[in-house]
């Protein structure tokens, strides 16, 4: 829903917060709010109801409805409602989020200690320590050990002396583990952000940056089997580095270790959902890069079983559904199941786009739109492909994903070629060429392909076209046969598309012809383009 927030003098904060609540969260807040309201008629609950039922924000009308004439009074009411909603949401999560549980337990322990109820405090502290160790919440573990140590002040000297060494050794171990965790998580976040620039690094500078991260990772102290969370951060960082350095066999092995860790520590899935989802993404991206389509299908299936059983947070499960959709769509495309491609897009694309806008970063949304755009192209829905590509190009102006930039600039002329819009094609090629040249981003592959498409569109006969294509494909063999430069064909197989023209085949039929049966099975494996 598009909400009108532009009216001068309106503060949209509380409006956005209330409109962003789920139906269950709204019901819970109303239920909790009535417990503390005076005869269920407190102004903050009335304001909540008015905003919830409003399509636009108009603070003058809200003040009139509440019979409030003082702006300071209204500002205070909004601030109170804002805080009360957030406090209630946090309280609502106390039995779902381990972080929230530990926070409440920590405050309860402090309260018990202040009241000198030391036995109860110590009992609760031990329970909280066990929970923090199970979920590797090292920050809380350190704080809880400090709280536990306060009990020493109430022991006699002999008890104090007997306990001190053991307690402080335990505290030191917790601090050491926290340091290892922080270092691994820091590097993971740093490497993960590189994928926001491009999932397909090719230039020497990009590869050198990732290589440095991998060297730093290898110098870190590895976790042992008792710290699966630290191991998951460490291995996910390693897998990302291996994927972006095109070390695909090693990445496959690392991804297998990651899956085994998740499968053996399913209690961590809902507590660290983004790490879990990133594991799936990296695994499937690597499968497609290795051209192992059956493996990609198997991995999304096995991870899906874990997600359905243990990923309880609705937001993150939607995120999984987006990844699942994108993976399945690529599987159907690469195995030439075009009716399934069409059915999947017609049935789910709209919902997935809504989920993406709701939960994904702008950079991640582009990957989903790109997959659907290519699907439209393969299905020969040229107008839909062009329309969606225009959206991708516009959004990427603010995001600047390098891989999407090159993809959109090259794929647009290909669409126009299929539409036989020669004037627009000529204009698009000149515009893209000058855009990249002016920014010193014109790489040899893009330069050659754009110049070739310009010559191809001007060819006077089929014979001339075929000769141009033959000559160009011979030059492209240098890219196709190089394990790194072959990645230029990863997002879209320009080589195969041109081969289909040479063979006078629809691109769909060309892709079907490229399939070969796996020996002893009914499955199909796409022939390598290397």
Mark where each language-model region is.
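Amphipathic alpha-helical segments of tetratricopeptide repeats
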Residues: 126-134, 168-176, 211-223, 256-268, ...
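Alpha-helical linker/edge segments of TPR/alpha-solenoid repeat scaffolds
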Residues: 149-164, 170-178, 188-196, 281-292, ...
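Flexible inter-repeat linkers and adjacent short helices
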Residues: 1-213, 222-225, 434, 449, ...
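Helix-turn-helix repeat elements of alpha-solenoid scaffolds
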Residues: 79-80, 115-126, 157-169, 200-218, ...
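Alpha-solenoid helical repeat architecture
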Residues: 136-143, 178-186, 225-233, 266-278, ...
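Alpha-solenoid helical-repeat scaffolds
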Residues: 158-163, 177-295
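Active-site/pore-lining binding-face segments in mid-to-C-terminal subdomains
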Residues: 395-465
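"A position-specific structural signal for the A-helix of alpha-solenoid helical repeats
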Residues: 100-103, 107-110, 140-143, 147, ...
